Amino acid sequence: MPVGVPKVPYRLPGDVQVQWIDLYNRLYRERILFLGQTVNYEIANQIIGLMLYLNGDDKSKDMYLYINSPGGAVVPGIAIYDTMQFVEPEIRTICMGVAASMGSFILTGGEITKRIALPHARVMIHQPSSSYYKDQAGELIMEAEEVLKLRDCITKVYVQRTGKPISVISEDMERDVFMSAKEAKEYGIVDLVALDVDSNS
């Protein structure tokens, strides 16, 4: 039987009475967001909406985006990334579990110096793939051209955000490249490994 979303106590400023609200609403009040599933239009629109609301609420306070995602659709992922660059508050990205494919792309979009991986997190990068299956040859050609444009866009972002040469990024995106938290730091996808007992990272 599903448990549902847990409720936690919360007291509004100035109120004596404690009210119970769902966990996610409580975390949103602390500017904490989650990407804990496959990236699609629905979750992208939810995260974008929250970022825009929090941007309007207070432009000076950082937001925290926790990522545990196997990746997903490219266009919604790019929309999240672009919104992260658009809003005024700095976005701290934290990888827990896995940030693969578009998950790693969003992870690298956090404010540089404020991108974190937990010690046992995994990161994976690769090239975008087509999510459409068309019958007509002309549509297949158009789809292939669009995938190449998206790949070029993603490659340029990784180059800009990691400091790696375009030749390295292009070669690595030819296959699935998995990294530990420490390797992701060395690669430039994250800046810190949190709670690292093996080093002072």
Curated annotation (Swiss-Prot):
Keyword Plastid: yes
Domain of life: Eukaryota
CDD domains per record: S14_ClpP_2
An individual GO BP term: protein quality control for misfolded or incompletely synthesized proteins
Catalytic activity reported: Hydrolysis of proteins to small peptides in the presence of ATP and magnesium. alpha-casein is the usual test substrate. In the absence of ATP, only oligopeptides shorter than five residues are hydrolyzed (such as succinyl-Leu-Tyr-|-NHMec, and Leu-Tyr-Leu-|-Tyr-Trp, in which cleavage of the -Tyr-|-Leu- and -Tyr-|-Trp bonds also occurs)
Active site: 101, 126
Subcellular location: Plastid, Chloroplast stroma
Family annotation (Gene3D superfamilies): 2-enoyl-CoA Hydratase, Chain A, domain 1
Principal localisation: plastid
GO molecular function, one term: ATPase binding
Any single Gene Ontology cellular-component annotation: chloroplast stroma
Keyword flag Plastid: yes
Signal sequence, start to end: none
Major enzyme class: hydrolase
Annotated function: Cleaves peptides in various proteins in a process that requires ATP hydrolysis. Has a chymotrypsin-like activity. Plays a major role in the degradation of misfolded proteins.
Subunit structure: Component of the chloroplastic Clp protease core complex.
Assigned protein family: Belongs to the peptidase S14 family.
The name this protein goes by in its record: ATP-dependent Clp protease proteolytic subunit
Species per Swiss-Prot/TrEMBL record: Chaetosphaeridium globosum (Charophycean green alga)
Gene: clpP
